[in-house]
């Protein structure tokens, strides 16, 4: 009985770890897409700010995300 409970606890912990790791990978991919789009747009337009309203995330530094409510992302 104890062995069965131990296996169940281990399975739950492994599933939780897999979910957390998957969310972290998705967040990292979104961050890289944002940084790539910001860099490419800044190079082609020659401007300091770029309109990327769909890329608001925790990696953005305020003032851009707070002042422009994710309409503009400033080149830092």
From Swiss-Prot:
The propeptide sits at 19-45
Which keywords does this chain's UniProt record carry?
A: Disulfide bond, Knottin, Neurotoxin, Secreted, Signal, Toxin
Instruction: Give a yes or no for keyword Calcium in this entry.
Output: no
Which Cys pairs are S-S linked? 49-65, 56-70, 64-74
A GO term, aspect molecular function = ion channel inhibitor activity
GO CC annotation terms, alphabetical: extracellular region
Q: Name one Pfam family in it.
A: Conotoxin
What InterPro entries does this protein map onto? Conotoxin
- Signal peptide positions on this chain: 1-18
Family, per the entry? Answer: Belongs to the conotoxin O2 superfamily.
Instruction: Tell me what this protein is called.
Output: Conotoxin VnMEKL-0111
- Cite the source lineage: Eukaryota, Metazoa, Spiralia, Lophotrochozoa, Mollusca
């Amino acid at each position: 009985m104890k062995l069965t409970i131990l296996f169940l606890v281990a399975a739950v912990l492994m599933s939780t770890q897999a979910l957390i790791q998957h969310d972290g990978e998705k967040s990292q991919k979104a961050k890289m897409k944002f940084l790539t789009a910001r860099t490419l747009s800044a190079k082609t337009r020659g401007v300091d700010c770029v309109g990327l309203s769909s890329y608001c995330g925790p990696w953005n530094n305020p003032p851009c995300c707070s002042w422009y409510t994710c309409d503009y992302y400033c080149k830092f």
